[in-house]
């Protein structure tokens, strides 16, 4: 099964929007996907600046087969960058619900 990277807004949101990332991860795993959740990934403890976090996230994104987008991704500078890079690399990027519908069909 494909490995999906979860992209969505974090900055300025309560709890960095982590609950939405964890919900998406749970649903995508239940549908059979492997999931790379930047809210969970190791090695981000030392990331105190946005640039540091994005460097780590973009390295992870490059190892995935597609991107599962959370609501509000287009209003997030980081998530929009992740999706743009995914598309530029030829990876599929769709809302989480689209991946779930596709897996169910």
Regions found by a protein language model. Give the residues of each.
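Conserved catalytic or regulatory cores that recognize and/or transform ribose-phosphate-containing ligands
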Residues: 1-105
């Amino acid at each position: 099964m494909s490995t999906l990277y979860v992209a969505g807004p974090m900055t300025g949101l309560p709890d960095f929007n982590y609950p939405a990332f964890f919900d998406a991860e749970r649903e995508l795993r239940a549908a059979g996907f492997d999931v790379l959740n930047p809210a969970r990934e190791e090695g981000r403890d030392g990331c105190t600046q946005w640039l540091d976090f994005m460097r780590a996230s973009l390295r992870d994104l490059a190892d995935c087969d597609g991107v599962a987008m959370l609501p509000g991704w287009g209003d997030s500078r980081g998530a929009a960058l992740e999706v743009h890079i995914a598309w530029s690399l030829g990876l599929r990027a769709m809302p989480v619900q689209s991946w779930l519908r596709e897996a169910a069909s």
